[in-house]
Amino acid sequence: MKSGIFDFLLVIPISKSIIYLGDVLLNNIALGVILITILINIIILPIMIKSTVSQQKMQLIQPEMERIQNKYKGRKDQTSQMRMSAEIQALYKKNDISMLASFTTFLTLPIMFAMWQAVQRIEILYQTNMFGINLGAKPIDHVFKFEIAYIVLLTIVALTQYFAMKINTIMSRRNTKYRETSQMQSMNMMNNFMTLFIIYFAAIMPAAMSLYWMTTNIITIVRTWYIYIYHVEKAQKEVDQANTNYLTKRQNKNK
């Protein structure tokens, strides 16, 4: 099979790293998958922090954004549009928001897809047993035989997938200013669909993929909790302080 540049740069190095770490150093290829998954998520953590903080700040400044947009509502002349754009830019600057930060998440997608491909292609992984589970077997074939290990595996995948999808909303609700928009409700519906989608594929694909999904889900939950507690909530305080300073300056100016 001919390898493309994507395989050469990402998939093959990740596959070899899993095999080396798991089979050579740890004598367990499944542990190699878990550790490389953790390592990759540590590498992309700074990108995820920047993106999540920026997205949360964007939500927090929505009332001010709407105030500016309403101020220029119906005014289509170039001067008004330029003033509105300048005020929005000033709002971003005041709250230290980069317009490009929310798009940085997309930079991580090739890496995560490469990890997915790497796990699928490591044949030795499907000959491995872990906790009484044959990682090459399809869980669905064993669930209907009431084999507990496979039932537990799919249950853990389902629960971790559900919370991995919900953790952003759960943590956002810690902020008293949080308001769920219609866009967020649509996103929640999509997340519910994705959860069912992943559970279905976890059931019909080799158990090695369930191991990968379970590890990724747990990391996502822990990572999101960490970002919100140590970065987002700090950013929320900065936005509140910036708004307070802005209002104070306006009041002093009007005196």
What are the roles of these predicted feature ranges?
Residues 1-255:
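Helix-loop-helix
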